[in-house]
Structure formats: structure tokens, C-alpha cells
């Protein structure tokens, strides 16, 4: 389906130069002189190579339609994630590199959504938030109450996050999977 370049959004899959690309970032740039253009950072679905492309906002690009399918995460097998279809119980091997750094947030039996283009996986979406345990947290520095102070902490999955001073090791917190930020104490 053809669409104007200025309607491209992160997460969409497009076809350009005979190859499929997933859009990582997009930014509309309006210079002081001349017409606006869109700067797009995208990754080749076959090779994983990243590139930047510029189009005028009036240019058209071929957007590929994606189909969403729900899966349950089972386990990691080398460089692949083993996901199970909850309806048919069939297993699917999907490259872990599609998920990127967010692979650290995968938990057993977690429900994930996979975007497919003509049967090929192009993106994996995790739940917006996950609950994890703090395994180590730096002590609070006294007298830092004038500004909103946060301290570094390490989660059970190895990811480091900034948490409020009242959070201690052994507590469970809710973390946003999109940007690895603290949300609240787990209830």
C-alpha cells in the first residue's frame, strides 16, 4: 500500500530498493529554506543492517501490511526464542535479535505479540510493564532531599535502573519495558 513519506512511523514495515525494512526512528525536518523532508532510520529485515534515508514529505513509499499474532514465550534456544501458539500449541522459532535489548525482560509463559509480514516475523511486542526483583541497590546518600534523587539498582534480569531512595534490595518493582524505567513498587 503506497503512502506519503510523512506518514511513516516507527515500527512500520516498508519496502524500499526491493528489500523490506522496519522503521526504527523517523523525524520530520523543516529547514529554514526549502521544503520539509523526513529522515528515517531503518533496519533491513534480512541482513539486520541499519541505514538512514531522506525523502521529501510528498514522496510516496510502499508500506507493507503486518498481521499481529499472539504467542506465549517458552524458552531461549541459542540465538532463537521459542514461542508457542496458545491456540494450536505449535512452536515457532524467532530470532532473538528482532527483540533487541528488551530480550532481558522476557519471562517464562509471558504473552507476547508478534508482527508478521507474509508469515515472516518482523517485530515482537512485550507487555508494557513487568514486575521484577531488586537484587542490589546502592545505599542512600544523606542530604540529597533537595532535588528528586534516584539511586542505581540492579534487577534480577541483570538490567540496571534508577529507583527512588526508599527502594531496597529484595523488593519487587514494576518496570516499563520500553525504556527500562521504574514505575512503582509492586503491590
Curated annotation (Swiss-Prot):
Q: What is its main location?
A: cytoplasm
Q: Which UniProt keywords apply?
A: Cytoplasm, Elongation factor, Protein biosynthesis
GO annotation, cellular component aspect: cytoplasm
Pathway assignment reads: Protein biosynthesis; polypeptide chain elongation
Q: Which GO BP terms sit in this record?
A: peptide biosynthetic process
Can you say where in the cell this protein is located? Cytoplasm
One Pfam family linked to the record: Elong-fact-P_C
The record's listing under InterPro entries reads: Elong-fact-P_C (IPR015365), NA-bd_OB-fold (IPR012340), Rib_uL2_dom2 (IPR014722), Transl_elong_fac_P/YeiP (IPR020599), Transl_elong_KOW-like (IPR013185), Transl_elong_P/YeiP_cen (IPR001059), Transl_elong_P/YeiP_CS (IPR013852), Transl_elongation_fac_P (IPR011768)
Gene3D superfamilies assigned to the protein according to its UniProt record, in alphabetical order: 2.30.30.30, Nucleic acid-binding proteins
MF terms per GO, please? translation elongation factor activity
Q: Which PANTHER family match?
A: ELONGATION FACTOR P, TRANSLATION ELONGATION FACTOR KOW-LIKE DOMAIN-CONTAINING PROTEIN
Function summary = Involved in peptide bond synthesis. Stimulates efficient translation and peptide-bond synthesis on native or reconstituted 70S ribosomes in vitro. Probably functions indirectly by altering the affinity of the ribosome for aminoacyl-tRNA, thus increasing their reactivity as acceptors for peptidyl transferase.
Query: What family classification does the UniProt entry report for this protein?
Result: Belongs to the elongation factor P family.
Name assigned to this protein: Elongation factor P
According to the entry, what is the taxonomic lineage of the organism?
Answer: Bacteria, Pseudomonadati, Pseudomonadota, Alphaproteobacteria, Acetobacterales
Gene designation:
efp
